[in-house]
């Protein structure tokens, strides 16, 4: 297996003979893959594809790619494994990035994104996080939560809730007592009738 400290260009130097022997049969497909991934330009692709000898084509391809730098060498090793149809441990460079244009293996510049360490705590996109009970628990956890909640509330609780919800009626203002009827004025007693003068005259006559 490729050494983690080994550069892609060093891997090509070490495995050059086996690469040339293995890639001769599918050199055209290898050229197509390198052109699609941006390693080769159009004129370079046309020049290599025009060579009639497959061995010479692969040898010139390896030299051309090594002259483009480590990013191109890295991409060549990836395309070589795919073109060969089976991964070869000798070509398995461990730090193969997602693409030639990304150049993720180069030393990062200050302020640029760097790959997260395995123990940094970041989760892969699409995987449920342990802190998410809905995703981590699955359907069983959701069923357990649903089974723990009562389906219908008790009637007593409903009655209490309805009482609390209804606003208390406001007390009616007390009516002021009607003013007491004024007492009717008392009638003055009629004076006694004066005695008739006949009796007085009789008394005077008796005295005389």
UniProtKB/Swiss-Prot annotation:
Impact when changing residue 17 to R: Abolished ubiquitination in response to an apoptotic stimulus
Triggers of expression: Protein expression decreases in hearts failure patients and in response to oxidative stress.
GO cellular component terms, A-Z: cytoplasm; cytosol; membrane; mitochondrion; nucleolus; sarcoplasmic reticulum
Written domain comment of the UniProt record: CARD is critical for both extrinsic and intrinsic apoptotic pathways. CARD domain mediates a protective effect against myocardial ischemia/reperfusion, oxidative stress and TNF-induced necrosis. The C-terminal domain (amino acids 99 to 208) is involved in calcium binding and plays a protective role in calcium-mediated cell death.
Region annotation (Disordered) ranges: 107-208
Domain CARD: start-end pairs: 4-95
Assembly information from the UniProt record: Oligomerizes (via CARD doamin). Interacts (via CARD domain) with CASP2; inhibits CASP2 activity in a phosphorylation-dependent manner. Interacts with CASP8; decreases CASP8 activity in a mitochondria localization- and phosphorylation-dependent manner and this interaction is dissociated by calcium. Interacts with TFPT; translocates NOL3 into the nucleus and negatively regulated TFPT-induced cell death.
Tissues where this protein is expressed: Highly expressed in heart and skeletal muscle. Detected at low levels in placenta, liver, kidney and pancreas.
Outcome after substituting residue 31 to F: Did not reduce creatine kinase release or infarct size after myocardial ischemia/reperfusion. Causes loss of mitochondrial membrane potential and nuclear condensation. Failes to prevent the increase in Bax. Interacts with BAX
Biological process, per Gene Ontology: blood vessel remodeling; cardiac muscle cell apoptotic process; intrinsic apoptotic signaling pathway; mRNA splice site recognition; negative regulation of apoptotic process; negative regulation of cardiac muscle cell apoptotic process; negative regulation of extrinsic apoptotic signaling pathway; negative regulation of hypoxia-induced intrinsic apoptotic signaling pathway
CDD domains noted in UniProt: CARD (cd01671)
PANTHER family assigned to the protein according to its UniProt record, in alphabetical order: CARD6/NUCLEOLAR PROTEIN 3, NUCLEOLAR PROTEIN 3
GO molecular function, one term: caspase binding
Organism (species): Homo sapiens
Protein name: Nucleolar protein 3
Effect of residue 163 to R: Abolished ubiquitination in response to an apoptotic stimulus
N-myristoyl glycine lipid sites: 2
């Amino acid at each position: 297996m490729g050494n983690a400290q080994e550069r892609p260009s060093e891997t090509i130097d070490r495995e050059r003979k086996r690469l040339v022997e293995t890639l001769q049969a599918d050199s055209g497909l290898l050229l197509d893959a390198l052109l699609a991934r941006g390693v080769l330009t159009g004129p370079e692709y046309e020049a290599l594809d025009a060579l009639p000898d497959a061995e010479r084509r692969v040898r010139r391809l390896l030299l051309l790619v090594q002259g483009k730098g480590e990013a191109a060498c890295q991409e060549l090793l990836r395309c070589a494994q795919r073109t060969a149809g089976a991964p070869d441990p000798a070509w398995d460079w461990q730090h193969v990035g997602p693409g030639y244009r990304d150049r993720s293996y180069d030393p990062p510049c200050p302020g640029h994104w760097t790959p997260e360490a395995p123990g940094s705590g970041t989760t892969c996109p699409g995987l449920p996080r342990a802190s998410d009970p809905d995703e981590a628990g699955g359907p069983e956890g959701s069923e357990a939560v649903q089974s723990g909640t009562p389906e219908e509330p008790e009637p007593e609780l409903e009655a209490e809730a309805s009482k609390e919800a209804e606003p208390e009626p406001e007390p009616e203002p007390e009516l002021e007592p009607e003013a007491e009827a004024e007492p009717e004025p008392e009638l003055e007693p009629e004076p006694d009738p004066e005695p008739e003068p006949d009796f007085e005259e009789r008394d005077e006559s008796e005295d005389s």
